[in-house]
Amino acid sequence: MKQKTILKEVSLKGPGLHFGQETCLTIKPASPDTGYIFKRVDLEGKPEIPAIADLVSDTSRGTTISKYKASVSTIEHLLAATYSLGLDNILFEIDGPEVPILDGSSKYFVEAFHKAGIKEQDAELKVYEINENLSFVDEERDIEISTFPDKSYKLKVLLDYKSEILSNQYAFLNNLKDFTKGVAPCRTFVFLSELEPLLHLNLIKGGDLDNAIVIVDKESTQEEFDRLAKLFNKPSVAVQSSGVLNNLKLQFTNEPARHKLLDVIGDLALTGFRFNGSVVARRPGHFGNTEMAKLIRQHILNQKNQPSPDNIPVYTQNSKPLMDSQKIKEILPNRYPFLFVDKIMSLTKTEVIGVKNVSNDEYYFSGHYPNNPVMPVALQLEAILQTAKLFLLSSNGSDKNTYEFPQISNIVFKRQVVPGDVLIIKVSQVDPVNGFIRLKGEAFVGTELVAEADIDAKKIK
C-alpha cells in the first residue's frame, strides 16, 4: 500500500465558528512522510504546526494545536475528511487562527479533496496494529474511550446526555469508505442551554442557525427565542417536532451521534499514524478524544522503537566465536581495563555481532555503585563504538587507515545493565550521510534492546 496526497492545490474560504474571522484555507500536496502540517501564512516567518496530539493546546469548544506562539483552531472536521479519504501527506496553508466552519460538517472538505484529485506516492504506507487494550476514563466528565486490537479501523460512539433527544443515541463506522456518505455531511450541534452563554463569551462569533444543530434541552419562552433570533440576525426561530431549534432538517435521526463520530476520527488523526484498532467512545468530546490520540500515538511510537524479531541477534554461551579476545587485540588498540568487546560472533560486509560479558568483578562496579552495581551508560556506548571500529577495520582488510567518529546521535539507553548480563552488540552499516559512513549501533540483553545510537564514521590517515 502506498502513501497518498492530492494532485493539485485547492482553496476554501469562510469564517471560523468561534472567532468569526474570515479565513482562506489552501490545501496543497506534500512529499512522502510529511504527514499533516498547518502553516500560518499570515504570521511573521509563516510558522508550521505539525498536526500531532503532542501539540494540542485547547479543547474547550474544538481542537486547537499550537507551536511557539502560533496556533490553529477547530481543525477536527478538516482532519476527519483528510484521514477518511486515505490522504497521508498534506500541507494546510491558512491565513487566520481558525479553520472555516462552512456548514459545520466535513462535507465541503471532502468535496474539495475530490476536486483536487488524489494520487499515490512512491513511498510505502505503514499501518500499525494496536496490540493491547488502551483506555482513557474521566470520571468527572463521565467520559470513557477505549481502543481494542482489531484487524481493521472501526469506531463506535455512544451518547448519553440528560436530554430526551440524546439520552441514548449511537453511531458506528466499520469502513472509512462509508465516511463520505454516512458521516461527512453530519453537522455540529450545541445544546440550547449552552448557546447564550457561548454567545456572551464571544465563543461562537462565526456560528449561525445554518451551520449548527441546536438541541432544545430546556423549557424556553418565546421571548428567549426572539432574543436568540436577534443574536443570529434571523427573523424568528422555533422548535421543530424533532426537538431541534430553527428550520434545519436532520439528515439522519442519529445525526448528532454521527457528528461525534466525525469528531473522533478528526481528533484521532492527531496520532500521526495509520492504525488498525476498534475505538469505542462513550460521551466523547475533544478533550477525551485527544487524550486517546496521545495514548495511541505513544503506543505506536513504542512499537517503532522496538526492533523486529528478525533483527534481534541470537547468542548462546556455547556458540563458537569468529574472533576471541586475542584476535580482537590484533585489530583494536584498546587494552584492559578499557577493552569492552570480548568476542565477535559474526562479521559480514554490512554487519557485525559482538559480545561483552558483564561480570561481577568489573573494576567500575566498586564505585558505580557500591551495593547496587550498574554498568555506566558511557561504557555501554563505548562497547558499541569499539564494535563499530572493529567492523570498519576488519571490513578494509589490509587497509592501514583508522577511523574516527565525528558525530554520534539519537543515543537512547532503555534499561540498566547489571552484573551477569551479556551485552550482545550489533552494528550495521546503512546509507552514507554527507560523506560519512553511517552505522546503526544496538546493544541487547537477551532479546531486549537496552541501548542504541546512530554513528557517523570518517576515515583518517
What are these regions (language model features)?
Residues 305-374, 394, 400-402, 417-418, ...:
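Non-catalytic linker/capping segments at the edges of enzyme domains
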Residues 1-88, 93-312:
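C-terminal regulatory domains involved in ligand/effector binding and gene-expression control
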Residues 435-440:
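Short aromatic-glycine-enriched beta-strand elements
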